[in-house]
Amino acid sequence: MVQVVENRSRVRGRVMNVAQHPTMDGYAVVDLALSDVAPVSGYANLFGHETGKVVSVNIPWGDARSHGLMPGDDLSAVVRRAGPQAVFADPASLAKG
């Protein structure tokens, strides 16, 4: 089993794709091309070397829809890595534009 240290990062990037998550009901997968990554005080920053990469971020489907997320949009959020391939956004931190 892989253990992940408690972590948070503030990211900004361009939405490349939005789709329903293939296995997690109620979630969207947003592919985000990261243009900026900043630490969140008190947490490890596991995204410090991810600038310029595309990261798949899990966002509750209702939040993705309420923000009208579409490819080409700019998005910022606080994210956490929950496993090697699992990244989740804090819905309260989502900001489009």
Segment roles from a protein language model:
Residues M1-Q3, Q20, H67:
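Outer-membrane beta-barrel proteins
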Residues Q3-G13, H49, D73:
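Short coil-to-beta-strand transition motifs
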Residues E6-A38:
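Structural detector for short beta-strands of small beta-barrel domains
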Residues V11, V55-I59:
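Generic detection of short hydrophobic beta-strand segments and adjacent strand-loop junctions
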Residues A19-P22, V79-G83:
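Short, low-complexity Ser/Thr-rich regulatory SLiMs
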Residues G26-S56:
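OB-fold (S1/OB) nucleic-acid-binding surfaces
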Residues L34-V37, R81-G97:
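OB-fold/S1-family single-stranded nucleic acid-binding modules
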Residues H49-G52, W61-A77:
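Short nucleic-acid-contacting surface segments enriched for D/E, G, S/T with interspersed K/R
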